[in-house]
Amino acid sequence: MQMNIGRCGPVCFSCSAPPSKSYTHRALIIAALADGQSEIIGQLDADDTRMTARALMQLGVRLDWSRENIRVQGTGGHLKAPVEEINIQDSGTSMRLLTGVSLLADGPVVLTGSGRMQERPLGPLIDTLNNAGAKITCLKNPGCPPVRIDGTFPAGDMYVDGSISSQFISSLLIAAPYADNDVHIHLTGDPVSLPYIMMTIDSMRAFGAEVLVDGDDKEPVFTISSQRRYKPQTYGIEGDFSSSSYWFALAAICGGSATISGLNPQSAQGDRRLLEILVNMGCSITEKRESIILSRDPDVLLKGIKVDMADCPDIVQTVCMVAAVSSSPTRITGVHHLRMKESDRIAAIANGLTTLGGRVETEEDVIVIHPAPLHGGIIHPENDHRTAMSFAVLGCFIGDVTILDAECVTKSYPGFWEELRRIWQNAVLC
């Protein structure tokens, strides 16, 4: 499927934030480990979250997924070894979070995925668990899926490299209450995406776990009590700042306003920082009780900024689209881990913007975007949902932009194209 995007003028629209993908993943897995039935309300129904649910069912978890909620019959931390390997396809979150959790099964578990998934790193997580006494074997390429997971979840001190993915730490955190004794997780390297770790801890505490945080942002230590295991809960999923970023960016790029409901202004989500970034680029923000409004006068030029985005990688592409129409250069640092996402996102940004006439410089950890006249073109997202959605938003400003393989957005936001079509059609009426 391809989507052809024409130019639209200033926008003026309201929409609801999709449910958080990150919180849905975490709630599903934690509820599956709790002792009793939990209800997850307002979940994200997308490819990735469905993949986590299917994997949990293969691990012996009973769940009932309806449009409004998911009822999960928890196992008390006693998972069943699956008869067949678990193929989580392209869901990196499922792969990483379930690697640690699979050590709670009563036998070996094999996790595999798509061709791209088999290139994505698991090494630091595997090394940490094996050094602590687990038995995890890579079945194809060193440090990558597919993996065979055996043994039990270890207690005591663990040291994990946090410079590649925060999901390695989240994987350890979520399973840790079911170790025989307390677990102490020490981060090494320069940790990235720390807010995602706090989202994990936030979810764990909501289900009754005890997690203590010591140290500082550079060398935090997390202590998880083995005496406070998960209890069943009724748990509501808050709105997703990552997916909402495209609508805020649309108003920033085209001018006008976007009113997004369902977002928590005090959320632990690191991608909430987008609002601060867009204000620094020339937009204004108004927070109301149940909505956040971003606006920009079309006569006021956007300006470039210098920003470190190590803690909010999922909105880097969104910010790059705004930078591409700004009046001065933008320099983004802290992005080295983007090369190991669903695609090499640094290359995707550079190639896509160059195709549309943009001027981009990249290094291992840096993206610099210069002002340049833009024109239409064809974008190949390489099955990366965030590439497709980001360039679609920019396409509304440029016009004559075609997004190939547009169905890839179902990974995180199945309703994206329908929502964009509605906003685009109404833009001329504002």
From Swiss-Prot:
This is 3-phosphoshikimate 1-carboxyvinyltransferase. It catalyses: 3-phosphoshikimate + phosphoenolpyruvate = 5-O-(1-carboxyvinyl)-3-phosphoshikimate + phosphate. One of its GO terms (cellular component) is cytoplasm. Keywords: Amino-acid biosynthesis, Aromatic amino acid biosynthesis, Cytoplasm, Transferase. The keyword Iron does not apply. Pathway: Metabolic intermediate biosynthesis; chorismate biosynthesis. It comes from the Archaea. Pfam families: EPSP_synthase. It is found in: Cytoplasm. 3-phosphoshikimate binds at residues 21-22, 26, 165-167, 193, 314, 341. One of its GO terms (molecular function) is 3-phosphoshikimate 1-carboxyvinyltransferase activity. Phosphoenolpyruvate binds at residues 21, 92, 120, 167, 345, 386, 411. Belongs to the EPSP synthase family. One of its GO terms (biological process) is amino acid biosynthetic process. The active site is at 314 (proton acceptor). Its EC number is 2.5.1.19. It comes from Methanospirillum hungatei JF-1 (strain ATCC 27890 / DSM 864 / NBRC 100397 / JF-1). NCBIfam families: aroA. Catalyzes the transfer of the enolpyruvyl moiety of phosphoenolpyruvate (PEP) to the 5-hydroxyl of shikimate-3-phosphate (S3P) to produce enolpyruvyl shikimate-3-phosphate and inorganic phosphate. PANTHER family: AROM/DEHYDROQUINATE SYNTHASE, PENTAFUNCTIONAL AROM POLYPEPTIDE.
